[in-house]
C-alpha cells in the first residue's frame, strides 16, 4: 500500500490530511523540494536537501531536521512505495494556526509532507526538443527561495500552454531570468550563458550539474545576464530542471532556434548528464 510521510509518520493516502488553517494552504507560507529517483536511487539528494534547509532558514522556519534525516526518510518512502523511476515531492509549512499574517506563536510546529510518484524520463523532449515562449517575469523578488508561492510561475506556464509551448522563458525588462519551472541557457559560439545566481532566479540543482559537466567537457560556462534578443539569436537554447533534465528548445516564440535542430553542445551536456546520474545517485 502506498505511504505518505506526514509529520513524522508514514501513513496511507486516506490518512494524509491537513487542516484548512495550515499556513501553506492559507498563505503559501512554506517551502518545497522535488527530487528525482533513477533506478530506485535518489539523485543529487544531498544538494536538494541542503537547498531545502537553506530555503527554510531564509523564511525563518526551523524544521529540526538534518540533511541526513531527510535523506533517510526519503529512502524509506522510495522503498515502501517501490519507486524505480520517479520523484519525491516534499514540502514544509509554518504549521496550523488561526489566520494572521504575522508568524504564529513558537509552540506551533511546522507541518511536513512528502510523497512519491512514478514519473518517466522525458525521452521525447530530450531527443527532439520542445517549443518555448518568452514572457515578462512578474514574480516576487526572492526567487532564490523555493517557496510555495508559485502563482507567477503558474501564469507563465499557462501562457506557454496557450501558445502550444512546453516552457515559458521569463525576462525582467530585456534581461532573461529563467523558465517558469526551469533554468534557461543560451549557447552562442561554443559558450554557455545563463543568468548569474542572485535573488532573481533559483539556483537549480540541475543547473549546478550542467556547470560541472561543462567544466568536464571544457565548454566555457558564463554566468552573466543576456537579453531576449540574444536568446532568440542563440545557436542553441536549453532549459533544465529536475524533471526536464537537459531539454533543448528548438523553437522560440514561433521561430526556429538557429536551424531548428538539437545542437552539438546540448548533446554533449545530455551525454554528461547520463554519466552524472550513474555517479551521483545513492
Curated annotation (Swiss-Prot):
Q: Which reaction is this enzyme known to catalyze? A: D-alanine + 2-oxoglutarate = D-glutamate + pyruvate
What InterPro entries does the database record attribute to this sequence? Aminotrans_IV (IPR001544), Aminotrans_IV_CS (IPR018300), Aminotransferase-like (IPR036038), BCAT-like_C (IPR043132), BCAT-like_N (IPR043131), Class-IV_PLP-Dep_Aminotrnsfr (IPR050571), D_amino_transT (IPR005784)
PROSITE patterns linked:
AA_TRANSFER_CLASS_4
Family annotation (Gene3D superfamilies): 3.30.470.10, D-amino Acid Aminotransferase, subunit A, domain 2
Q: Where is the active site?
A: 146
Instruction: Cite the binding residues for substrate.
Output: 32, 99, 101
Give a GO cellular-component term.
cytosol
Keywords per UniProt: Aminotransferase, Pyridoxal phosphate, Transferase
- Residues bearing N6-(pyridoxal phosphate)lysine are 146
EC number of this enzyme: 2.6.1.21
Record: residues binding pyridoxal 5'-phosphate:
51, 178
Q: Which cofactor does it need?
A: pyridoxal 5'-phosphate
Q: Which domain of life is it from?
A: Bacteria
GO biological process terms, alphabetically, are:
D-amino acid biosynthetic process; D-amino acid catabolic process
Q: Which Pfam families match?
A: Aminotran_4
Matching SUPFAM superfamilies = D-aminoacid aminotransferase-like PLP-dependent enzymes (SSF56752)
Q: Which GO terms describe its molecular function?
A: D-alanine-2-oxoglutarate aminotransferase activity; pyridoxal phosphate binding
State its role.
Acts on the D-isomers of alanine, leucine, aspartate, glutamate, aminobutyrate, norvaline and asparagine. The enzyme transfers an amino group from a substrate D-amino acid to the pyridoxal phosphate cofactor to form pyridoxamine and an alpha-keto acid in the first half-reaction. The second half-reaction is the reverse of the first, transferring the amino group from the pyridoxamine to a second alpha-keto acid to form the product D-amino acid via a ping-pong mechanism. This is an important process in the formation of D-alanine and D-glutamate, which are essential bacterial cell wall components.
Similarity comment: Belongs to the class-IV pyridoxal-phosphate-dependent aminotransferase family.
Record's subunit section: Homodimer.
Name listed for the protein in its UniProt record: D-alanine aminotransferase
Amino acid at each position: 500500500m502506498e505511504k505518505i510521510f506526514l509529520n513524522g509518520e508514514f501513513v496511507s493516502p486516506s490518512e494524509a490530511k491537513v487542516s484548512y488553517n495550515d499556513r501553506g494552504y492559507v498563505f503559501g507560507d512554506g517551502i518545497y523540494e522535488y527530487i528525482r529517483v533513477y533506478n530506485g536511487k535518489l539523485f543529487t539528494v544531498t544538494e536538494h536537501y541542503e537547498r531545502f534547509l537553506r530555503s527554510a532558514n531564509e523564511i525563518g522556519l526551523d524544521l529540526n531536521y538534518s540533511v541526513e534525516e531527510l535523506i533517510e526518510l526519503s529512502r524509506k518512502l522510495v522503498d515502501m512505495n517501490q519507486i524505480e523511476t520517479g520523484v519525491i515531492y516534499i514540502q514544509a509549512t509554518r504549521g496550523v494556526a488561526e489566520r494572521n499574517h504575522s508568524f504564529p506563536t513558537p509552540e506551533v510546529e511546522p507541518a511536513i509532507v512528502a510523497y512519491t510518484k512514478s514519473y518517466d524520463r522525458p525521452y521525447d523532449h530530450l531527443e527532439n526538443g520542445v517549443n518555448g515562449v518568452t514572457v515578462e517575469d512578474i514574480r516576487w523578488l526572492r526567487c532564490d527561495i523555493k517557496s510555495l508561492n508559485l502563482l507567477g510561475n503558474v501564469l507563465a506556464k499557462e501562457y506557454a500552454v496557450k501558445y502550444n509551448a512546453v516552457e515559458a522563458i521569463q525576462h525582467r525588462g530585456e534581461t532573461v531570468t529563467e523558465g517558469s519551472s526551469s533554468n534557461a541557457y543560451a549557447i552562442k559560439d561554443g559558450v554557455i550563458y545563463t543568468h548569474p545566481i542572485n535573488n532573481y532566479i533559483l539556483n537549480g540543482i540541475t543547473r549546478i550539474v550542467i556547470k560541472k559537466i561543462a567544466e568536464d567537457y571544457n565548454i566555457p560556462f558564463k554566468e552573466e545576464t543576456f537579453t531576449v534578443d540574444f536568446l532568440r539569436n542563440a545557436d542553441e537554447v536549453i532549459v533544465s530542471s529536475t524533471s526536464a533534465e537537459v531539454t533543448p528548445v528548438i523553437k522560440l516564440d514561433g521561430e526556429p532556434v538557429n536551424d531548428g535542430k538539437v545542437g552539438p553542445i546540448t548533446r554533449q551536456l545530455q551525454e554528461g548528464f547520463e554519466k552524472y546520474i550513474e555517479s551521483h545517485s545513492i
